């Protein structure tokens, strides 16, 4: 576990960070409530404030932006046709939810790969479509910033990789 001082040294006010399901957030500062210390984030997606308890921020999926190498690796995952796509939608749903919970860009790319390929065979059920859209959005958002590309340009890259499957 990181101590409060380690975490506060790790994230600077104004820094962009990724917080699992919220995606891209801006670090706004520290707050203390009821004796617990929190990192205050601003969600760029829905313009809301998010408090992350410092004691388990990492387990909750708070992380720094990925490196260019990590983004490139995630983009490579998009064209990996050897990744399994389960027939049983409940198994697929649980696996993809677990992958999304890890919050890593690799995991997000695996979800995009799996559900994109599945959608080419059969329309996705509503819950899976929502996970797919969320994963795609997270991938695009982080890749755009790290690689310095706009959304339209990044979508072209992502879908050309997916189409190569």
Please annotate each region the language model reported.
Residues 57-165:
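Charge/polar-rich, low-complexity and marginally structured segments
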Residues 1-62:
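A positional/architectural concept
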């Amino acid at each position: 576990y990181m101590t409060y001082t380690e975490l506060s040294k790790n994230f600077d006010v104004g820094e962009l960070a990724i917080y699992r399901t919220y995606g891209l957030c801006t670090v706004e500062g520290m707050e203390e409530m009821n004796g617990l210390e929190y990192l205050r984030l601003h969600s760029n997606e829905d313009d809301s404030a998010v408090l992350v308890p410092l004691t388990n921020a990492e387990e909750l999926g708070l992380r720094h932006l990925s490196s260019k190498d990590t983004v490139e690796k995630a983009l490579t995952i998009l064209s990996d046709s050897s990744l399994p796509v389960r027939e049983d939608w409940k198994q697929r749903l649980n696996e993809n939810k677990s992958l999304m919970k890890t919050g890593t860009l690799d995991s997000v790319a695996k979800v995009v790969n799996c559900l994109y390929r599945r959608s080419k065979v059969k329309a996705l059920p509503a819950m899976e479509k929502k996970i797919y859209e969320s994963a795609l959005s997270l991938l695009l958002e982080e890749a755009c910033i790290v690689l310095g590309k706009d959304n339209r340009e990044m979508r072209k890259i992502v879908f050309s990789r997916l189409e190569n499957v």
